[in-house]
UniProtKB/Swiss-Prot annotation:
Its cofactor is Mg(2+); K(+). One of its GO terms (biological process) is S-adenosylmethionine biosynthetic process. It comes from Prochlorococcus marinus (strain MIT 9515). K(+) binds at E43. This is S-adenosylmethionine synthase. The keyword Transferase applies.
């Protein structure tokens, strides 16, 4: 099927699930800042007036978890009576954290199939499969639907934080449908934005009038600014633009829906455009291959596309708990590569060290929170972990590796 419509969604930082992702990653940042060897598997739950912090943590760091949770909730925008029914100052914060099981840690601490230096003897923290993807649809080598959905969600939050549209509240979602012809994006079919807002806007209380005002304001302040640099632009004549289709969105955030860490894994990755291994990222330290190996798989896929060895590349990695080397490596370029799949796999094996400790070292995943003032992973917890031009993410910096692949691939051309 070469002609189709593909749709991806994103959510703002005030979405209940994203509140949880940010809290879990804020805990991870704080622990790694004080103790880079911390083992963290932190889960968060939010509901009306409640935040629960749970999971397993082994660390020398000492944190005021309740204070940290309230800080994150406040910075998102949930503070005071006007914040949409969830208040950082008054919500209950419960902490129920345990230590990591010794049965898990013994397999992670030293893998049994390597005899090299101890640094590279770290086994995978769990079994699992991870996918990485890249394509040439956007400058950041991401699929256009998720790229644009993230742009819209970030801009929606920006105009709220900067009081450009002071009636907006923290919860919100975006969705973008792109028309493809012969597998290439050609136009923006539909843009959907659902955003929480105050019940009264500039003295307007009529539901229909409120929705029309929000629609007009979002087109001017959100849609147009984030699409001005795109080759494919929306138009009021050809692009369907939907805003709050149910009519109003006053009750939102944790007051409207419960939230949980790890429930937006498609938003975090490729918007459904590529396969997903099922593992979430937030709240997990770098020994968890759900996170670190997914970053590495993206690094490999993006390097391949950046090197122009393929227009699209999907890389699957699999691991076994306590074993350092990947159990399997698979690459699929969907018929777009200039060399064979077997040759691409050989290039990957010869140019990328995909053992967990090597990935951690390559990207400096344990030390980045401390180097960056105590906040790194939390910034990835909203608006995607990949294709982030607003963040300096090591797995997105592929120029050097792509050049290596160009040189190494000459033997196969």
């Amino acid at each position: 099927m070469s002609d189709f419509i593909f749709t991806s969604e994103s959510v703002t930082e005030g979405h209940p699930d994203k509140i949880c992702d940010q809290i879990s990653d804020a805990v991870l940042d704080a622990l790694l800042k004080e103790d880079p060897e911390s083992r963290v598997a932190c889960e968060t739950v939010v509901n009306t007036g409640l935040c629960l912090l749970t999971g397993e943590i082994t660390s020398r760091a000492k944190l005021d978890y309740i204070k940290l949770v309230r800080k994150v909730i406040k910075e998102i925008g949930y503070e005071g009576a006007k914040a949409g029914g969830f208040d950082s100052n008054s919500c209950a914060v419960l902490v129920a954290l345990d230590e990591q099981s010794p049965d898990i840690s013994q397999g992670v601490n030293e893998a049994d199939d390597l005899n090299e230096d101890l640094e590279n003897n770290t086994g995978a923290g769990d079994q699992g499969i991870m996918f990485g993807y890249a394509c040439d649809e956007t400058p950041e080598l991401m699929p256009l639907p998720i790229s644009l959905a993230h742009r819209l969600a970030r801009q929606l939050a920006k105009v709220r934080h900067e009081n450009v549209l002071e009636y907006l509240l923290p919860d919100g979602k975006t969705q973008v449908s792109i028309d493809y012809k012969k597998g290439v994006p050609v136009s923006i079919n539909t843009i959907l934005i659902s955003t929480q807002h105050r019940a009264e806007i500039d003295g307007i209380i009529n539901e229909k009038e409120i929705r029309q005002k929000i629609t007009d304001d979002l087109w001017i302040n959100v849609v147009l600014p984030v699409t001005e640099d795109l080759e494919i632009k929306p138009s009021k004549e050809k692009t369907r633009f939907l805003v709050n289709p149910t009519g109003k969105f006053v009750v939102g955030g944790p007051q409207g829906d419960a939230g949980l860490t790890g429930r937006k894994i498609i938003v975090d990755t490729y918007g459904g455009y590529a396969r997903h291994g099922g593992g979430a990222f937030s709240g997990k330290d770098p020994t968890k291959v759900d996170r670190s190996a997914a970053y590495a798989a993206r690094y490999v896929a993006k390097s391949i596309v950046k090197a122009k060895l393929a227009k699209k590349a999907e890389v699957q990695l699999s691991y076994a708990i306590g074993v350092a080397k990947p159990i399997s490596i698979l690459v699929d370029t969907f018929g777009t590569s200039v060399i064979s799949q077997d040759n691409l796999k050989e290039l990957i094996e010869n140019n990328f060290d995909l053992r967990p400790a090597a990935i951690i070292k390559e990207f400096d995943l344990r030390n980045l929170p401390k180097k960056l003032g105590g906040e790194f992973y939390r910034k990835t917890a909203s608006y995607g972990h990949f294709g982030r031009n607003d963040l300096n993410l090591p797995w997105e910096s592929v120029e050097v590796k792509a050049a290596q692949l160009v040189e190494a691939s000459k033997d196969f051309l």
